Design a protein with these regions (language model features):
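Hydrophobic ligand-binding cavity/cleft-lining segments
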Residues: 1-48
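Hydrophobic-ligand binding "helix-grip"
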Residues: 34, 59-112, 118-120, 148
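Short coil-to-beta transition motif at edge beta-strands of beta-rich domains
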Residues: 46-58
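A conserved amphipathic terminal alpha-helix motif
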Residues: 112-153
Length: 153
């Protein structure tokens, strides 16, 4: 079974406008299609190991009775206007090390944006059997919200 989803979409905006939104905690909440991200605290990120807090609510997935909880988003890759990736540290210990990210490629019409979700680093087989937590359609929907958000600025 695949341990990675990748979805690509052309967004009619400059890479810098897209990347700026992706570096802000509020931007993550604004484009989330799962309904889990409720609010966030922290400053925009600008380097690997930068982090911020997201207040979550698992109710929207209706899969586990976790209720409200917080996660720390930790940046694992950062190339300005090109690539951002992060993992989360939440309630599970040790952390699972699943990754989310965006790669941006400038085009004549805007930016080709690839969103990905990678759970290949998860080593706990019992937990790994529950992956993916976010479906591929969720990434596609989030890209749609991202497009709407930056194209209408």
């Amino acid at each position: 079974m695949a341990e990675l989803f990748e979805i690509t979409r052309l967004i009619y905006a400059e890479p810098s406008a897209i990347f700026e939104l992706l570096t802000t905690p509020e931007g993550h909440v604004a484009i989330d299609s799962s309904g889990m991200l409720q609010s966030a605290e922290g400053s925009p990120v600008s380097a690997v190991d930068d982090e911020f807090v997201v207040h979550m609510d698992r109710e929207s997935l209706n899969d586990l009775p976790m209720g409200k909880y917080d996660v720390r988003v930790i940046i694992t890759a950062f190339e300005k206007d090109r690539w951002i990736e992060w993992t989360i540290i939440g309630t599970v210990r040790p952390p699972l090390d699943h990754r989310y990210g965006y790669r941006l490629e400038p085009t004549d019409d805007g930016t080709l944006v690839t969103s990905y979700y990678d759970w290949s680093r998860v080593t706990n087989e019992d937990i790994k059997g529950r992956f993916p937590i976010i479906p591929e359609a969720g990434l596609r929907a989030t890209l749609g919200i991202l497009a709407r958000t930056v194209e209408n600025r």
